Amino acid sequence: MTYNPRDHYFRKAKQENFAARSVFKLEEIDQKFKMFKPGQVVLDLGASPGSWSQYASKMAGEKGRVLGVDLSPVTVKLKNAVFIQADLRDLNLEDIFKEHGFVPPFDIVMSDMAPKTTGIRMTDQARSMELCELALDVARRFLKKDGHFVCKLFHSDDFGKLRDEMKKTFAKVEAVKPDSTRKISKEIFLVGLSKK
């Protein structure tokens, strides 16, 4: 099967006015685990181009809020969302929350962060793992009790270690490869449900 950048999910995203096809990965995960509810406050790490924030914004509704952080700009406009263009590692999150009127803890912390790929599998996997560990650290600090966490990473030999690490923080941890993920992709999503 050849790679088609304009596949069914790409076209569907355009038809439904989502910034990217990745929205359907999050939607599938949510349909499986029922994480999103009206009125939630959501932290979106690696928010660009904005499709995960669009989904979270829609599900959280007018009483909910979304804070997105990414190195790249997010151009979608959402009434209940704020976007910060910065490297997460350089931010004092407490200051950012205060500046934009967010009061942790968050109901959901989600990360679609991905490293700039080098084409060297082990390097890309290690960088992806580092980003997921960074997101997990943020979730441990700012996610409410019983809150949920979703993180994308490239599958590697260290995958099991990260899953075990998440089990210390969450009542249930699941690994998911949504149908909307390209077949050739090494992406997998770790879902942490009900923070202890």
Curated annotation (Swiss-Prot):
Top-level division of the source organism's lineage: Bacteria
Function: Specifically methylates the uridine in position 2552 of 23S rRNA at the 2'-O position of the ribose in the fully assembled 50S ribosomal subunit.
Residues at which S-adenosyl-L-methionine binds: G50, W52, D70, D87, D112
Protein's cellular compartments: Cytoplasm
HAMAP family the UniProt entry points to: RNA_methyltr_E
InterPro entries in alphabetical order: RNA_methyltr_RlmE (IPR050082), RNA_MeTrfase_FtsJ_dom (IPR002877), rRNA-MeTfrase_E (IPR015507), SAM-dependent_MTases_sf (IPR029063)
Catalytic activity, as annotated: uridine(2552) in 23S rRNA + S-adenosyl-L-methionine = 2'-O-methyluridine(2552) in 23S rRNA + S-adenosyl-L-homocysteine + H(+)
Name of this chain's protein: Ribosomal RNA large subunit methyltransferase E
First-tier enzyme category under EC: transferase
Keywords for this protein: Cytoplasm, Methyltransferase, rRNA processing, S-adenosyl-L-methionine, Transferase
The enzyme's E.C. designation: 2.1.1.166
Record-level Gene Ontology MF annotations: rRNA (uridine-2'-O-)-methyltransferase activity
Family (UniProt): Belongs to the class I-like SAM-binding methyltransferase superfamily. RNA methyltransferase RlmE family.
GO cellular component: cytoplasm
Pfam families registered for this protein in UniProt: FtsJ
Active site, UniProt feature: K152 (proton acceptor)
